[in-house]
Amino acid sequence: MRVMGIDPGSKCTGCGVIDEVNSELKVVYWGSIKTKPRQSFPERLKFIYDELVAVIKEFNPDEIAVEDMFFATNVKSALKLGQTRGVAILSAVNEGKPVAEYSPLEVKQSVVGYGRAEKQQVQDMVTTLLRLKEKPETFDASDALAIAICHIHAATANLKIKTAKGT
């Protein structure tokens, strides 16, 4: 199974692609989509959309996992994040890919074992789990890889449950 994880952000959106074969995880790609501060917000959304579609077309993931919204105290930031998430989900759906969503707590719990882990802890664990020679250049990229790992763990658990039930 090939999974693409997306960590949406209007300034920097992380994306990562991981293959899972015979319970082994192998990183295929990771990167950050950085928008320009002078771009209007709609231009940023279009840029993020176009870049995500290009990654989807290049690496052809079977499924895409997107980080769900966290609690935000700033309404304007929450709205922008929601719109950026919408663009990420739309890029997947328009390319015919199924989408799963996970909260930051679920991702951290799955990857680090602690739902309130710091970004550095997530990055360190992603680097270890994927046996990377170097850490991803941004927390957005390592978070995206963590989201993909979380989805692989969830999909594997769901498959085991279905197999045990005989469905």
What are these regions (language model features)?
Residues M1-T167:
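Phosphate- and other anionic-substrate recognition elements at nucleic-acid/protein interfaces
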